[in-house]
Amino acid sequence: MNTDNGMILITALIRPHMEGHVVRALHDLADFPGFTFDEVRGQGRGRGQGGAYVVSDEDITYHQYLELRLVCPADQADEICRRIEAAAWTGRKGDGVVYTMPVNTFARIREAGAKEHRHD
């Protein structure tokens, strides 16, 4: 397992109807990194009408998003984030967010398993 790999985890929350645009933008990359989508729901920073935030058990509402996760080399992260942002943009409130975190360890299970089962 590599612990000094210069890898970055990119996480993006996007509107579900923008999925095709984002996938196309990722497939257009020279070094396509692969990715995972999950359906998620949540609330942003916005408040209700008049700036008041009122919640009761009956009226809690959530926005539906897709959470995209991918791991890439650190030198590709800025470009990938820019492409995700451009592809997911509608210009409306609630377009989503993109953020990154360093990855401390990274191993492809297939490759790591092959090393363990090699009969030299």
PLM regions with names:
Residues M1-D120:
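Positively charged, small/polar-rich N-terminal and surface patches that mediate targeting and assembly
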